[in-house]
């Protein structure tokens, strides 16, 4: 019998009082450490995964197929997402949600509830009308299985949408989200911080490219803002050929960059014509970023 077994057997045969005395004797023989006991290190909460557009899309529309098995729902959701024209809008909504997710969850606002209010502000189709609006239907194939069919491809329209995350949040609060939040002010304050907010360009991609081209090429930009016979358009007819800068003598302080006389004259004329009352139609269009006629 080993020494350990003998000790255990002997300890088991001791009376209750003797056992306690034996335990104290064992503890007294153990070495005492003067080193402080390290406190357990608390792990920082793991950052939650950012919600992307498809995750939000699936969360909102997957109940359309709730009566089908999972192996059928997933492919159908992938097909709907593939042909959905609002990927940018979904990415924007979910980016805003991700930036304030912790604050919303603390007040029991789920992703589904956020989307319920956000899609109306983004001009997206609600769940009950989605399939019919985009020409989708479920039907039976020849072998009797259920499949997804598209019978029509409708025109897509986009409404004027919120310009940033704070604007989207405010519109959601106004449309009813506020009744689910006991204190929305910290969330509003967070989105007022540019490091948390994000900007949304509320135009289709081909319109965005058009603005880029106009900004890079003034000869494209002016005809898009004013009719061909307008005084302002005539002023910039040869802007690409003007010398834009020169060096002006500044006495003892050397030279500094400036604009050429030709360019200064042209700019003054543009501003004078542009501020004329007859141009209010164009000034308003510029301010509102709307297409113009005339």
Curated annotation (Swiss-Prot):
GO terms of biological process kind: positive regulation of mating-type specific transcription, DNA-templated
GO molecular function: DNA binding, bending
Xref: PROSITE patterns: ALPHA_BOX
Cell location: Nucleus
GO cellular component terms, A-Z: nucleus
InterPro entries per UniProt: MATalpha_HMGbox
Chief location: nucleus
Residue ranges the UniProt entry marks as DNA-binding: 46-101
UniProt KW keywords: DNA-binding, Nucleus, Transcription, Transcription regulation
Function according to Swiss-Prot or TrEMBL: Mating type proteins are sequence specific DNA-binding proteins that act as master switches in fungal differentiation by controlling gene expression in a cell type-specific fashion. Transcriptional activator that induces the transcription of alpha-specific genes.
Family per similarity comment: Belongs to the MATALPHA1 family.
Protein name: Mating type protein mtA-1
Gene behind this protein: MTA1
